[in-house]
């Protein structure tokens, strides 16, 4: 039986979008009907998302969600009240009205058709989690992804995630992108009163191997080539310029290493232990953009690193930089399972990454060196690796990684029983879902 998968993803150009595209590419269209819900007005207003949209595989069917959902006044009141006070409502009548609104929207989009699986791939907006969960109330298996350490995301950036957490009990699977991340989120969200129990699953990100390897063969940007010509060692990092990506600490680490270099150039040394830490003529290329770009530029100037740290901006093809650098550094304060780390290991680039659950697992599967997140810790890890490069290099079997990740993904979004019965022609009718609205109070 060819199974129908219904996804929603925002297609913001980041690691989540890269992993999503790789997953779609890996799904065999002879086995799966792959469908993606989009909002046309959102795409029209965001050219960067349009670029991701154009990269969708040809076998993906696009379903538009036009206009606004029809609603009754008391239903809309419940939806608005939940947005303001997600932990306050536990009555059956409240949740009956809430779900009536979203179930009607599922029928507006797909009519009476019910997909085998409905997946909210982003996992950050309660509106989309609610819509996906509403298909579950009609018979779909439903999933919501976790791409990061959600307690950190909630405390540091997105207080509205409390609404998403409250809705976890209304999907069948909460899918973290690594086993370690699943353990972290299960434990930390329990401290917030969110019980995930057996609902918490994991499935690692996939990688578009061909795109990475072919992309790395293209010419590198002139600014990166100039940086390599002027420095003995060139580092790179990739990611949006935001607090949790911790690029500021990496920039300060480069300053520390170059300060040592300057001290050495003026001092011939006397062979004592204090002179043993030889300085490095080191440069850094940062790929990405974001709200902290101005702050990072100012920090580069204040540290006297103009000409040594180059901001390359958002790149459609960052792989010549990633493959051409001596070392990829991922200094994040919290992460899920970063696609950039997979890409670096696929290209054979040496890796230093902060000691976080997702990073730790990937380095165990492949190679690399873990570090702390302070400028001093990062500088020490960089110096160790550049003086002994083999410590951060190794072999990563990306084909095996992708095969295992796809199996885990299908197991999570379809359910192990459905996956193991893939070859059967006749399936029992979709199971009826009992209302779980009353359970909201148990996890609030």
Where are these regions (language model features)?
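Short beta-strand->alpha-helix junction loop in the catalytic core
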Residues: 150, 180-181, 197-218, 291
């Amino acid at each position: 039986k060819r199974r129908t998968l219904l996804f929603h993803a925002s297609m913001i150009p980041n690691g989540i979008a890269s992993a999503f595209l790789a997953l779609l590419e890996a799904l065999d269209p002879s086995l799966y009907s792959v469908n993606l819900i989009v909002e046309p007005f959102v795409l029209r207003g965001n050219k960067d998302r349009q670029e991701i949209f154009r990269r969708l595989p040809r076998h993906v069917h696009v379903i538009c969600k036009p206009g606004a959902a029809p609603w009754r006044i008391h239903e809309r009141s419940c939806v608005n009240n939940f947005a303001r006070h997600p932990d306050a409502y536990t009555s059956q009548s409240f949740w009956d009205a809430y779900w009536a609104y979203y179930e009607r929207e599922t029928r507006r989009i797909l009519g009476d058709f019910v997909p085998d699986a409905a997946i909210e791939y982003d996992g950050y907006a309660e509106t989309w989690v609610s819509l996906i969960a509403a298909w579950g109330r009609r018979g779909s298996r439903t999933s919501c992804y976790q791409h990061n350490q959600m307690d950190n995301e909630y405390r540091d950036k997105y207080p509205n995630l409390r609404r998403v957490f409250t809705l976890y009990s209304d999907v069948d699977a909460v899918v973290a992108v690594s086993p370690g991340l699943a353990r972290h989120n299960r434990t930390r969200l329990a401290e917030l009163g969110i019980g995930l129990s057996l609902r918490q699953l994991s499935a690692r990100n996939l990688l578009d191997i061909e795109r990475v390897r072919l992309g790395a063969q293209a010419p590198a940007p002139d600014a990166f080539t100039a940086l390599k010509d002027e420095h003995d060692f060139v580092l790179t990092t990739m990611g949006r310029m935001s607090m949790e990506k911790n690029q500021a600490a990496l920039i300060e680490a480069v300053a520390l290493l170059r300060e040592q270099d300057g001290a050495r150039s003026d001092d011939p040394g006397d062979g004592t232990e204090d002179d043993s830490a030889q300085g490095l003529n080191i440069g850094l290329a940062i790929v990405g953009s974001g709200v902290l770009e101005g702050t990072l530029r100012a920090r580069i100037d204040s540290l006297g690193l103009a000409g040594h740290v180059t901001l390359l901006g958002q790149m459609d093809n960052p792989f010549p930089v990633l493959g051409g650098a001596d070392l990829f550094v991922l200094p994040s304060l919290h992460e899920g399972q970063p696609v950039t780390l997979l890409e670096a290991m696929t290209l054979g680039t040496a890796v230093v990454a902060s000691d976080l659950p997702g990073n730790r697992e990937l380095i165990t599967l492949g190679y690399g060196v873990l570090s702390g997140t302070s400028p001093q810790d990062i500088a020490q890890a960089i110096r160790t690796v550049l003086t002994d490069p083999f410590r951060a290099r190794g072999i990563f079997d990306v084909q095996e990684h992708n095969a295992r990740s796809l199996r885990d993904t299908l197991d999570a979004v379809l359910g192990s029983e459905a996956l193991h019965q893939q070859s059967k022609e006749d399936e029992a009718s979709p199971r009826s879902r009992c209302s779980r609205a009353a359970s909201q109070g148990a996890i609030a």
